[in-house]
Amino acid sequence: MKRTGPTDPNLRRLIRFLKKKSNEEGVKIWKDLAWRLERPRRQRAEVNVSKINRYAKDGDMIVVPGSVLGAGKLEKKVIVAAWKFSETARKKITEAGGEAITIEELIERNPKGSGVIIME
């Protein structure tokens, strides 16, 4: 059976955008992120806020190629970019003094991808 990739048109647009930015900027992190987002939904990352709290430091830029979920607590001020956020995850990130942004917004802020951590 032929692999079709994601059927969500917004996700397809994001993947094309990531590949284009990777080629324009010469940065491999965006191509890697596009590859991770192309995976089947059941293999896509689902990261809880507690995992971000465990592994991140204050001021880190974290990108999740999937969903951020609200289980656990967050005590660090971090910038988190992801494909999707649950309502509780978005609330906990902003209450801790961090930011929950889209992947496109992260690329606008940091087109070279320096200091970005991919978390799965």
UniProtKB/Swiss-Prot annotation:
<dbReference type="InterPro" id="IPR021132">
    <property type="entry name" value="Ribosomal_eL18/eL18-A/B/_CS"/>
</dbReference>
<dbReference type="InterPro" id="IPR022947">
    <property type="entry name" value="Ribosomal_eL18_arc"/>
</dbReference>
<dbReference type="GO" id="GO:0003735">
    <property type="term" value="F:structural constituent of ribosome"/>
</dbReference>
<protein>
    <recommendedName>
        <fullName>Large ribosomal subunit protein eL18</fullName>
    </recommendedName>
</protein>
<dbReference type="InterPro" id="IPR000039">
    <property type="entry name" value="Ribosomal_eL18"/>
</dbReference>
<dbReference type="InterPro" id="IPR021131">
    <property type="entry name" value="Ribosomal_uL15/eL18"/>
</dbReference>
<keyword id="KW-0687">Ribonucleoprotein</keyword>
<comment type="similarity">
    <text>Belongs to the eukaryotic ribosomal protein eL18 family.</text>
</comment>
<dbReference type="InterPro" id="IPR036227">
    <property type="entry name" value="Ribosomal_uL15/eL18_sf"/>
</dbReference>
<keyword id="KW-0689">Ribosomal protein</keyword>
<dbReference type="GO" id="GO:0003723">
    <property type="term" value="F:RNA binding"/>
</dbReference>
<dbReference type="GO" id="GO:0006412">
    <property type="term" value="P:translation"/>
</dbReference>
<dbReference type="Pfam" id="PF17135">
    <property type="entry name" value="Ribosomal_L18"/>
</dbReference>
<dbReference type="GO" id="GO:0022625">
    <property type="term" value="C:cytosolic large ribosomal subunit"/>
</dbReference>
